[in-house]
Design a protein with these regions (language model features):
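Beta-strand-rich interaction surfaces with strong enrichment in secreted/lumenal proteins
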Residues: 74, 144-146, 285-290
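Short, hydrophobic/aromatic beta-strand segments
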Residues: 54-56, 165-171, 312-313
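Short, acidic/polar linear motifs in exposed loop/turn regions
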Residues: 163-165, 306
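Active-site/ligand-binding surface loops and adjacent short beta/alpha elements
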Residues: 166-168, 172-250
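Beta-strand-rich N-terminal accessory domains
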Residues: 1-79, 227-248, 256, 294-311
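Acidic/His-leaning functional-site neighborhoods
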Residues: 107, 213-288, 309
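Extended, loop-rich substrate-binding clefts of extracytoplasmic carbohydrate-active enzymes
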Residues: 23-28, 98-150
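Short, well-ordered beta-strand segments enriched in hydrophobic/aromatic residues
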Residues: 43-45, 147, 153-161
């Protein structure tokens, strides 16, 4: 089945839609957007790149940052917001001349299923290797992404090697979390983790103590085992809990004011209003090998709750 275009929205709604719960609508990118909704909240997912564009729990502020309305971005451009799917490479570790963060975020995904109950609304998307993906990465694969809205937002990515040779993968979910002010945030769950700092003059591995108060540009790359984190947003008085599986690293990133190359993407002060907390496998030993027929699962669940004092920050 070919990847759907805007003209396919009516057929998608007949086959996979449910009024008020699962609705496909056109976009200016000639690739539909699916809206998932229920009593707990709503989310929008673009079929181009399988990128979650928004997530809003009922009665609460949006959880995800998007610098510009989706329909105002150039067709095929990188969307620096929402939750990009980074696969089969993370950051700039792909082949020479390749795009940032892999091929999955630049491809049109198919819809293969949907379901809903009183408490959960879910859509299943799929992407297979083809002549276009082979131009950037010459391997056969199949990806399946399930996005569901319940009391939390959940993304579950399964990657399968459908070829005859093993390949190496780095991957990640790259959520941009909306915050009132970057300098009023901190990340819990990294105490005791070994980490590297992309901007530090010393490049060795060190051990982190306490929570991470986000105050500067760059990335902290944590080696994680617990895989339970909390982004405390003291400006909005809320906590965003992130639980993941299948990742060996956690990247906490913000471009900062000094990153001039990011101004076009985020606007003059957009950097102040998001923090990325990214469950991933980075371009070091944290990647994994997939033999023919093997699969790997990466999962992330996000829940936004008021900061009522039940979640306590631990400063260094």
């Amino acid at each position: 089945m070919k990847a759907p275009r805007n003209a396919d929205c009516e057929a998608l709604n007949r086959r996979f839609g449910a009024p008020g719960r699962i609705v496909f609508r056109p976009s200016k990118h000639d690739a539909p957007i699916v809206v998932l909704a229920n009593q707990y909240g709503s989310a929008e997912v673009a079929l181009f790149g399988a990128q979650t564009l928004s997530y809003r729990p009922t009665g609460n502020p949006p959880v995800l940052y998007l610098p510009h309305p989706y329909d105002e971005t150039p067709a095929g451009a990188e969307i620096h917001g929402g939750i990009p799917v980074c696969w089969p490479w993370f950051a700039r570790c792909g082949p020479a001349g390749s795009k940032l963060h892999g091929v999955a975020r630049y491809a049109r995904w198919r819809v293969t299923g949907s379901e809903y109950s009183e408490d959960v609304t879910e859509v299943t998307l799929a992407l297979e290797s083809d002549a276009e993906t082979w131009k950037a990465w010459p391997h056969d694969f199949a990806l399946e992404l399930k996005v569901s809205v319940s009391m939390k937002l959940t993304l579950a990515l399964r990657a399968t090697n459908t070829g005859t040779e093993a390949f190496h993968v780095t991957e990640g979910f790259h959520p941009y979390f909306l915050v009132r002010e970057r300098d009023q945030t901190e990340v819990l769950g990294v105490d005791g983790c070994e980490f590297t700092d992309t901007r530090a003059p010393e490049k060795g591995v060190r051990t982190w103590t306490g929570s991470y108060a986000v105050r500067e540009a760059g990335s902290k790359i944590y080696q994680v085992t617990k895989r339970e984190y909390v982004l405390m947003d003291h400006g909005l008085n809320r906590a965003i809990a992130v639980v993941s599986r299948g990742n060996a690293r956690l990247v906490v990133w913000n471009p900062g004011e000094e990153s001039a190359d990011q101004v076009a993407a985020f606007g003059v002060d957009g950097w102040r209003h998001f923090v990325c907390v990214e469950p991933c496998s980075t371009p070091d030993e944290a990647g994994y090998d997939l033999k023919p027929g093997e699969s790997h699962d990466l999962l992330m669940a996000v829940q936004s709750v008021p900061n009522d004092g039940s979640v306590h920050a631990r400063h260094p």
